[in-house]
Protein backbone atom coordinates (compact mmCIF):
# COMPACT_ATOMS: atom_id res chain seq x y z
CA UNK A 1 0.00 0.00 0.00
CA UNK A 2 1.37 3.42 -0.96
CA UNK A 3 2.31 5.74 1.86
CA UNK A 4 0.30 8.95 2.05
CA UNK A 5 2.06 12.24 1.32
CA UNK A 6 2.11 14.54 4.34
CA UNK A 7 0.04 17.71 4.06
CA UNK A 8 2.55 20.52 4.10
CA UNK A 9 1.91 24.25 3.79
CA UNK A 10 4.66 26.84 3.86
CA UNK A 11 3.62 30.36 4.86
CA UNK A 12 5.99 32.97 3.45
CA UNK A 13 6.30 36.73 3.42
CA UNK A 14 4.54 38.33 0.46
CA UNK A 15 6.27 40.78 -1.84
CA UNK A 16 5.56 44.49 -2.01
CA UNK A 17 2.34 43.84 -3.93
CA UNK A 18 0.99 41.78 -1.00
CA UNK A 19 0.35 38.71 -3.16
CA UNK A 20 3.45 37.37 -4.90
CA UNK A 21 6.25 35.57 -3.06
CA UNK A 22 8.63 38.04 -1.45
CA UNK A 23 12.41 38.03 -1.35
CA UNK A 24 12.91 36.53 2.11
CA UNK A 25 16.01 34.27 2.15
CA UNK A 26 14.60 32.20 5.04
CA UNK A 27 11.42 31.45 3.07
CA UNK A 28 13.50 30.60 0.00
CA UNK A 29 15.67 28.26 2.07
CA UNK A 30 12.68 26.27 3.36
CA UNK A 31 11.14 26.23 -0.12
CA UNK A 32 14.36 24.67 -1.45
CA UNK A 33 14.50 22.07 1.35
CA UNK A 34 10.95 20.94 0.58
CA UNK A 35 11.59 20.98 -3.17
CA UNK A 36 14.84 18.99 -2.85
CA UNK A 37 13.08 16.46 -0.62
CA UNK A 38 10.49 15.98 -3.38
CA UNK A 39 7.55 16.83 -1.14
CA UNK A 40 4.30 18.14 -2.59
CA UNK A 41 3.50 21.30 -0.66
CA UNK A 42 1.44 24.47 -0.85
CA UNK A 43 2.87 27.95 -0.51
CA UNK A 44 0.73 30.67 1.06
CA UNK A 45 1.91 34.26 0.87
CA UNK A 46 1.20 36.44 3.88
CA UNK A 47 0.89 40.19 3.53
CA UNK A 48 2.59 41.40 6.71
CA UNK A 49 0.50 44.58 6.66
CA UNK A 50 -2.80 42.70 6.51
CA UNK A 51 -2.51 39.30 8.20
CA UNK A 52 -5.66 37.25 7.90
CA UNK A 53 -7.53 35.90 10.90
CA UNK A 54 -6.56 32.36 9.87
CA UNK A 55 -2.85 33.22 9.92
CA UNK A 56 -3.26 34.98 13.29
CA UNK A 57 -4.89 31.84 14.73
CA UNK A 58 -2.25 29.50 13.32
CA UNK A 59 0.75 31.52 14.43
CA UNK A 60 -0.22 34.51 16.59
CA UNK A 61 2.59 37.03 16.54
CA UNK A 62 4.77 34.47 14.81
CA UNK A 63 7.53 35.37 12.42
CA UNK A 64 7.49 34.30 8.82
CA UNK A 65 8.16 31.82 7.42
CA UNK A 66 6.32 29.13 9.33
CA UNK A 67 5.27 25.64 8.38
CA UNK A 68 1.99 23.78 8.82
CA UNK A 69 2.70 20.03 8.79
CA UNK A 70 -0.63 18.25 9.05
CA UNK A 71 -2.09 20.09 12.05
CA UNK A 72 1.27 20.99 13.64
CA UNK A 73 2.62 24.54 13.34
CA UNK A 74 6.41 24.89 13.25
CA UNK A 75 8.32 28.14 13.56
CA UNK A 76 12.00 29.16 13.37
CA UNK A 77 13.75 28.34 10.11
CA UNK A 78 16.51 26.21 11.66
CA UNK A 79 14.08 24.20 13.77
CA UNK A 80 11.79 23.68 10.77
CA UNK A 81 14.72 22.42 8.72
CA UNK A 82 15.73 20.00 11.51
CA UNK A 83 12.13 18.82 11.84
CA UNK A 84 11.83 18.20 8.09
CA UNK A 85 15.12 16.29 8.03
CA UNK A 86 13.83 14.10 10.90
CA UNK A 87 10.35 13.32 9.56
CA UNK A 88 11.04 13.32 5.82
CA UNK A 89 13.87 10.81 5.98
CA UNK A 90 15.27 7.98 3.86
CA UNK A 91 14.39 5.72 2.24
CA UNK A 92 11.39 7.66 0.91
CA UNK A 93 12.99 11.11 1.02
CA UNK A 94 16.63 12.03 0.39
CA UNK A 95 18.88 13.05 3.26
CA UNK A 96 20.04 16.64 2.76
CA UNK A 97 22.56 16.80 5.60
CA UNK A 98 26.24 16.96 4.71
CA UNK A 99 28.04 13.61 4.34
CA UNK A 100 30.95 14.86 6.44
CA UNK A 101 29.88 16.54 9.71
CA UNK A 102 33.05 18.67 9.59
CA UNK A 103 31.67 20.50 6.56
CA UNK A 104 29.07 22.15 8.82
CA UNK A 105 31.84 24.12 10.50
CA UNK A 106 33.88 24.96 7.40
CA UNK A 107 34.59 28.66 7.20
CA UNK A 108 33.64 29.49 10.79
CA UNK A 109 37.17 30.70 11.51
CA UNK A 110 37.18 33.24 8.69
UniProtKB/Swiss-Prot annotation:
Entry-annotated residues carrying N-acetylalanine: 2
Keyword Cell membrane listed: yes
Cysteines joined through disulfide linkages: 24-59
Region feature (Required for insertion into the membrane): 2-90
Keywords in alphabetical order: Acetylation, Cell membrane, Chloride, Chloride channel, Cytoplasm, Disulfide bond, Endoplasmic reticulum, Ion channel, Ion transport, Membrane, Nucleus, Oxidoreductase, Transmembrane, Transmembrane helix, Transport, Voltage-gated channel
Chain span(s) of sequence motif G-site: 24-27
Annotated TM spans: 26-46
Primary location group: nucleus
Localization in the cell: Nucleus; Nucleus membrane; Cytoplasm; Cell membrane
Superkingdom of the organism of origin: Eukaryota
Cellular component annotations (GO), alphabetically ordered: chloride channel complex; endoplasmic reticulum; nuclear membrane; plasma membrane
Record PTM N6-acetyllysine, positions in chain: 13
Pfam families in the record: CLIC-like_N
Enzyme class: oxidoreductase
MF terms (GO), sorted A to Z: chloride channel activity; oxidoreductase activity
Subunit composition and interactions: Monomer. Homodimer (in vitro). Interacts with TRAPPC2. Dimerization requires a conformation change that leads to the exposure of a large hydrophobic surface. In vivo, this may lead to membrane insertion.
Domains (record comment): The active G-site contains a monothiol Cys-X-X-Ser motif which mediates glutathione-dependent redox catalysis.
Role description: In the soluble state, catalyzes glutaredoxin-like thiol disulfide exchange reactions with reduced glutathione as electron donor. Reduces selenite and dehydroascorbate and may act as an antioxidant during oxidative stress response. Can insert into membranes and form voltage-dependent multi-ion conductive channels. Membrane insertion seems to be redox-regulated and may occur only under oxidizing conditions. Involved in regulation of the cell cycle.
Family of this protein: Belongs to the chloride channel CLIC family.
Name of this protein: Chloride intracellular channel protein 1
Organism: Sus scrofa (Pig)
Amino acid sequence: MAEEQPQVELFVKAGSDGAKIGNCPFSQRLFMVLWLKGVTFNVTTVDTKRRTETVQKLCPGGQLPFLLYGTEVHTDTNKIEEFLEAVLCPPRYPKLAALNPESNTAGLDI
